Amino acid sequence: MSLAVCIILSGDYHYALSKSPDRHPTNEEVYREIGYETIDKALQEFAAHFNQGIELPLRTPPISFTHTLGRFNDLDGEDKDSLEIKYINEKLPDNHYKITVRPVEHRFPFKEEEVIKVIKLQDGEEAVYLDRDGFNVLSFERGYWQYTLSINKRASDLMLPGVLVQIANSIEFATEES
């Protein structure tokens, strides 16, 4: 009993709880452990690394999310560096949406057999709608960046590619406002 009081008084109560073998880590702890942080912080790190400004879409899919997270992946060589923005719902695991951004010069390739269709965006550029690993994906280029919007197929069964296109087009609006 006195050990518990010492832990509480020393301010290490939260730490002691988090290291308990009977306690499961929270989503926040798990994501923090693998490098996720606030979207703003990840955006700043990514933009500073490439010395380029970046805009994110203003829109999100019309499904509910409980968490928004960001991670700048600074890996070996700039060709592997990317920004990941995740939107998840801890109560509905199928509600998983991700934005990945990388420089156009290091664009992520895709296979022709993955392409469902090519769609023209509002700015006249083409986007590729893909079926990849259980996700519906829209990949397009805007300025210096390649954007890849991915949404879990189980969450997007009722959504047409038009939803991802609306999200992609909302970057143009954000750019005009800057």
Model-derived regions: residue spans:
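Short, solvent-exposed recognition patches
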Residues: 21-137, 142-143
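Surface-exposed amphipathic alpha-helical segments
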Residues: 148-178
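Generic hydrophobic/packing signal
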Residues: 12, 125-126, 164
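A sequence-composition feature that detects small, non-aromatic residues
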Residues: 4, 16, 42, 47-48, ...
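Sec-dependent N-terminal signal peptides of Gram-positive bacterial secreted proteins and lipoproteins
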Residues: 1-18
